[in-house]
């Protein structure tokens, strides 16, 4: 049976024309026979095909909607798997939560391309996908741990403490809530302080990355 501190469980729980120009004809050339009239009129050079443009926009919107829908669905599945792990912590539920995390990352990573077309996404993206992170903000780390230079919260260890101190500020972390965790992102002005999102959950499920 896997035993987990209540703080760890709480933190883990809270935790998308080429326009061709023909050569001029020789005006002295012999006249050619007139071609039969047709019902199709070629669009003027540079003209926009409104129907085609609308079709492209609709297709793009459909793709975006599908990707974000998949991302939301798999995130909810991840939440369910994490809840099951917290309720019954063992190897099976842990592995199921890890598998759900991996599955949830696929559509979310696909959604990253759409950030460049909608700046609103950047308002919350950091709460979901910020990286890299100093794991010592969240929990204990190996002695070989190296953190971002000048990060005052690099070894704060939210899970092991009811209060953390960053510089002259003392922060109550006795009760871990979504709002509290969100407020700890970029703590002390360091982008390496990440308390929410996929990578914080990844650390809680797999532990510290010692391969880098």
Feature locations, PLM:
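Compositionally biased, proline/threonine/alanine/serine-rich low-complexity intrinsically disordered stretches
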Residues: 26-46
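Bacterial signal peptide processing site
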Residues: 21-25
């Amino acid at each position: 049976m896997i035993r987990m501190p209540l703080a760890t469980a709480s933190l883990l729980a809270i935790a998308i024309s080429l326009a061709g120009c023909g050569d001029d004809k020789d005006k002295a050339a012999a006249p050619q026979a007139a071609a039969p009239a047709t019902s199709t009129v070629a669009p003027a050079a540079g003209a926009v095909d409104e129907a085609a443009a609308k079709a492209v926009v609709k297709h793009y919107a459909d793709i975006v909607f599908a990707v974000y829908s998949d991302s939301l669905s798999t995130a909810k599945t991840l939440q369910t798997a994490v809840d099951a792990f917290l309720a019954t912590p063992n190897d099976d539920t842990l592995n199921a939560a890890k598998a759900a995390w991996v599955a949830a990352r696929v559509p979310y990573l696909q959604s990253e391309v759409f950030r460049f077309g909608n700046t609103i996404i950047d308002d919350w993206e950091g709460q979901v996908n910020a990286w890299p992170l100093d794991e010592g903000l969240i929990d204990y780390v190996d002695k070989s741990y190296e953190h971002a230079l000048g990060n005052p919260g690099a070894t704060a260890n939210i899970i092991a403490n009811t209060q953390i101190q960053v510089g002259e500020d003392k922060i109550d972390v006795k009760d871990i809530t979504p709002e509290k965790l969100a407020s700890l992102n970029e703590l002390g002005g360091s982008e390496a302080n990440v308390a929410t999102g996929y990578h914080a959950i990844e650390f809680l499920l797999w532990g510290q990355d010692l391969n880098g």
